[in-house]
Every structure is written in C-alpha cells, then in structure tokens.
Amino acid sequence: MKMTPLMEQYLKIKEQYKDSILLFRLGDFYEAFFEDAKTVSKVLNIVLTKRQDAPMAGIPYHALNTYLKKLVEAGYKVAICDQMEEPSKSKKLIRREVTRVVTPGAIVEDEFLSETNNYMVVLVREKEKYCAVFCDVSTGEVLIHESIDEQEVLDLMKAYSVSEIVCPEGLESEVREKLPGVYIEVIDEWYFSEPEEEVKRIYGIEDIHHFELSSLAMKSLSALIKYIKYTMISEKLNLKPPVTISRKNFMILDSATVENLSLIPGEKGKNLFDVLNHTETPMGARLLKKWILHPLTDRQQIEDRLNAVEKLKEDRLKLEQIRNLLSRVRDVERIVSRVEYNRAIPRDLVALRETLSVVPELNEELSNFDFFEKLNFPDSLFDLLCKAIEDDPAGSPGEGKVIKRGFSPELDEYRDLLEHSEEKLKEFEEREREKTGIQKLKVGYNQVFGYYIEVTKANLDKVPEDYERKQTLVNSERFTTPELKEFETKIMAAKERIEELEKELFRNVCEEVKKHKETLLEISEELARIDVLATLAYDAILYNYTRPTFSEDRMEIIGGRHPVVERFTRDFVENDLYMDDEKRFTVITGPNMSGKSTFIRQVGLISLMAQIGSFVPAKKAVLPVFDRIFTRMGARDDLAGGRSTFLVEMNEMALILLKATKKSLVLLDEVGRGTGTQDGISIAWAISEELISRGCKVLFATHFIELTNLENSFPQVQNKTILVKEEGSNVVFTHRVVDGVADRSYGADRSYGIEVARIAGIPENVIRRAFEIMEKGFKTKSQRKNGKVKKFSQQIPLFPA
C-alpha cells in the first residue's frame, strides 16, 4: 500500500496509542483503520469499508458520544484524535492531535453518566499495606483509604461500584480474580515518581503536609494525577483536596453488611437508599449514598446532624420552601468539571446560571438556621452568565445562537448582515426580474453551488450576457453574476465570522467560570449538605420517624420497624428490643417466614440510620454508638470463587471474630446451617461463646433450638421467639417478638415448614403427601436403639431453601 501523508500521520499517532482504539477525525467523520476498524465495525454494527486497501469504519462527528459510550461499555479504551485547525484555512496536511483518552473511569459527559458517582481507583500495595485512591473525575472528588486488610479494601471498592481499577503490573492478576468484570488499566513505575512535586503542582500549594498523607498515599495520589492527565490530555485538573476514609471518623462497612442490609441499589431490589432518597439535587443524592455507606462514629457529629434535621422538621413551611428552591439546582460539581476540561456545552452554563439564581433566595431562607453557612454569591460571574448566554442556546457554539444579542457589538453586526440577507436577496431578485423581463426568475442556494439565479428553458433567450452559467438541469439552468458572487462572499464570511466569534466568546465565558471554581465547588458542597439534611427531615415527617438518643451501652427500641419492608407491607408489626451490658446476646428462635431475619435486619438499619444523622422508624430508640455493624446472613455460595455455602459462611464469621469489639453490633442469621446438624450446632455454640466473651451486642436468629440453652450457662444471654398462632389447620405468623423459646411441643408431630409451603402456593395434594411422609418416614428413621422415637424438636423443621 502506498503511504500517503495522511496515512503516515495516522500511523505516527497510532504508535503512541497502541493499546487504544484510535478515532481519527476526517472532515465530518471519525475514522478507524486496520484492526481498530474491524473492532469498531463489529461492536457498533456499522459497515466496514476500505481506503487505499486499509480496512476503515467511520462514525459521524456529531454522533461521537453515542458510539463512544458503546465502545467504552464494551470494555475498550478509545483515543480521540481531532483536527486542530480549520480545513479551509490550511493548504497543507491538517494538524491533528489526540485530545482525550476515554476509559470507563475518565468520563465527564452527562450522556455517559447517571446521577451516582463514577469512581476509578488507583490501587497500590507496598509490603503488607494497601492504598486505594478513589476519584470521580466528573466531580473532582478524591478519597483515600489505607489498610493492611485486603478484604476491607475490596469491600470498599465493591461498595463504591468502581468502574475502573488502575494498578501496577504486580497486582493485575489478583485484582482480576477478586473483581472480575471491572476494567483494569496497568501502569508502570514512572507514574509513582516525584510524588510530592506532582501533588504540589496540581493543587498549587507548597506545603502539602496538611493533607496528612503517608508516603504510600502520596505516591498513589501522584499516580492518580498522572493518569488523569494522560486521559484528559490536560495539565490542569479539577481535583478536590483528598479526604481520608478512616475508622477514626467513619464506620467501615464490609460488602456482606452492605448487601445483607440492602443499603444501596444492587441486585436485591428495594433498599434503604431508595426509601430515604428524596433529594432534590444530584449532588445531594451522591452525598446521601456516601453517608449511608460511611455512618459516623463520633457522637457529637451525629448529634449535630440530628439537631439540624430536627430544626428543619419543626419548621415545615421553611423546609418546603428550601426543598422547592433546591429543585431548581443543577449538577454544579459536574458542570465545573466539564468547564475545567473544556468539555462544557452552552446548556451547562445555563444550568449554572439557574443554580446561582437560587443562592440569594436560599441564603434568605437559611438565615434562621445557625448550622448552615451563608453561601458565597459570585455576583460578577452571575451577571456575566445573564448577559452572555442565551436562555435556550444551540447545542454547541457555531451551531446557532449561543451568545445573547447586545453582548458583543461585532457579533451583532454580522448577525444583522445575515438577518437582512433574505431581504436583500428579495430586492436583488426583483431587480433582476425587472432588468431581464423574466417574471419566473428565482434566486436560490445550495451547499454545492452556493447562491444562484434559476431560469427556465423557455426564458433562456432573455438571459443577459453578464450571466455566468453554473449548472444545467432538465427544465432550467442556473447562473451567477458578479453582484451575486460579491453578496455570497460577504454572507459566507459573515457566517464563518459568527461561528468564530461565538466559539471565542463562549471560551472566554468558560475561562471566567474557571476563575470562580473554588467558590462554585464550595457552593456545590454546601448545597449537597443542605439537600441531604432537608431530605432526612422530610423523611422523618413522611414516614413518622423518631429522633434517636444515645447511651454508652443501652439499646432500647420501642415500636421498631424495618424502614424498607414497612414501605411495601400493609400493617407492618412493630417490635421492641432491650439490650445492655448485662443482657447483650439475644438468641431468636422461630419457624421460617415468622420474621426473625426482618427483625434482626431492622435493628441493624435503625442503628445505622441513627449514625448517619437520620431519625429512625421507632416510637423510641436509645442506642449505643457502634464502631462496626457485622452481618452473617443467608445461604450463599461463591461458584466463581469455588467456595461452598459453608465455606463462605465460615469466611464471613472468621472476619467478624477477627474484627468485632465491645462496641460492635453483630447480626447473625442461621450460622452453622451449611453443614451437618451436629457440626453446625457445635460451631454455632463455640462462636456464641467467643462473641459473649468479646462483650459486643449480638442478635442471633437460629433454627438450632439447642442454642437457647446458652441462657442457662451465660447470664448475658436472653431468648426471644416469634409468636405463632394456630387457627384450626392454619398457622398464623404474628411477626411479634416475645420473650422465650420457640414451642418445643410440636416436635416431629408438627412442621411449620410444610405450612410455609402451603402459603407459598404448593398444591394441596403435595402438602398432604408431605405430612404423610413426615408422620411415617421420619419417625421410622429416627428410632433409637432402645426402641424410643427421637423427637425432632431439637431442630425446628425448615422449608428447604
């Protein structure tokens, strides 16, 4: 294949981005060549063509984001190569450069993103210590977590639903195994060089010690900065100062607890976030999720939030006015990011203007609340946005009106020329008709031939000599004249100049926005906080929640409810619980579907909600401030990891036994069920003894009736059961938690499991047969050597999972 200058240019750029699909701007299309073209054609289902024997596939430039999204979602890294000069102004080969590298975590455009955070993470291990630096490029947020506990770091990555992991080569295989399906980018040692200088440069500070980062965290942050520079092709980044996630301030939740308590949207459907999320702003929704994932452990900070929620709840009129104002607020964080990376569109600036218009009114409404800081109002920027940007602008500068009339005299002059062009064309047309006597003479325009005079074949004999032929059609011919040519030159120059001016003026306005970045981010942060606190106040009113109070060791819940289940269940049954240092271990027995699991989950959720600063679903709640909430629930296997249900169960229990302290809350459901009955009881008993000795608060829901005997050996243990009533042949699950032990008297003569099967809709003939088998078969098998029948009351019969 003969190498043209264009293809040489392409190959030179492609050499620098070998691991990316290169989309190369050619006029109105982005083209991919060679293997990239085959990939693009296959993924996007577009035609594969050829250019000089090179496979080629193209997408229209105006539809770039639509196709780009599909490529990134398919797991590809894409380098965008743009034309850096106007084709009309260059007689040589147009200069082209890569303007960005798109990966799942390096995205700022709204089309790609939901309201939730889109985190990438730089993961580094040094000796036995891990450092994870999370960054949402679209908001500029940076979070750092260090730990010697690999599982803790993995849990955080799962909770944050990271879209991209950036790590050194030595970690790649481990990460792929532990987090399959997540996009991974491997980086070399250069990314970790000169860390302090890199951090100083990007944050524009000389003293970085107030960040209080370890050398490992500093290196990891530096790697993040260099990687974002590489993807955004920019030396200036929109990054907020790093925030450290530590146990000193926050509760660290493992992935099992996040999943078992259904805290955030996932595979299990209804969740706490969806119930509480009545936020009015995208920033507020993201912050609420963060609060749920990181409950506070400092009592004063919790009380501060609760005080704010209570004050807002008490003044319903103000609360409604505040929420109405917040509903006009747009996603300031992401707008600032797009402006910083030169990805903003005119509608972003309109949204920013709308948000700023709310600030003075909001300041007025918040003036009575001392827990809110007065929002800074950038008057000059607001005035500029009001004067410069149209209310309903075109999609991008140069595509139509973006800059308001009156902002630029030069732009107005060219617009006047264009707007009066139709009028002038009509005048020209009338003059030519009079001059030639051709009444059907028309002046028109098309993109190929420009402006023309059209004359029918019947009138060709009247055409003057100064008419220059441009095009012959079936029934007519088209001409031009020196006057029409001059008019066309002026019009085309005006259009071109309008496009140039609009782009230039829009860039200037964006530069002014950049100067106010810090103020805008402060406004965004405070708006998010106001939104979440107002939402929690609204939830408290809507759902009839109560303010919790705190105690060193006492847990007293009266009329407690499950915040999620009650939303989708009629006549939810409230329950009470009392625990303290003397009675800190509660064993709960009862048949399936009686409500054991719901009860222990609601205790966990009430505790967690209190520590995010929310009112809680109870008539009264006195709670300790827990350092951790642990859960071990349900039968789950790990087919991908090759772990059985029982092994998963024991792995999770090992984590709890390793980390639970006197200040922890431990919720256990069916521990020991994944193995044989005797093994299971023995393990469950031994685990219980260990947790009792630790001094943590424990709720243990079980079918092992033997565990109720713990009460006889340990004064810290109390037994609870779920009250079940029988009405004739039917079983009624009251869902009421009472003192005592599940009724042993039924033994093998009665199975609630079969009743559960009946409720689930198993046919009646199958139910009758199950009772027959239970009566005949199980009794025969359970004969002791001495001829006596062994009672099966030792384990409450289960409906098979």
From Swiss-Prot:
One of its GO terms (cellular component) is cytosol. The keyword DNA-binding applies. PROSITE patterns: DNA_MISMATCH_REPAIR_2. One of its GO terms (biological process) is mismatch repair. SMART domains: MUTSac, MUTSd. Keywords: ATP-binding, DNA damage, DNA repair, DNA-binding, Nucleotide-binding. The keyword Glycosyltransferase does not apply. This protein is involved in the repair of mismatches in DNA. It is possible that it carries out the mismatch recognition step. This protein has a weak ATPase activity. This is DNA mismatch repair protein MutS. It comes from Thermotoga neapolitana (strain ATCC 49049 / DSM 4359 / NBRC 107923 / NS-E).
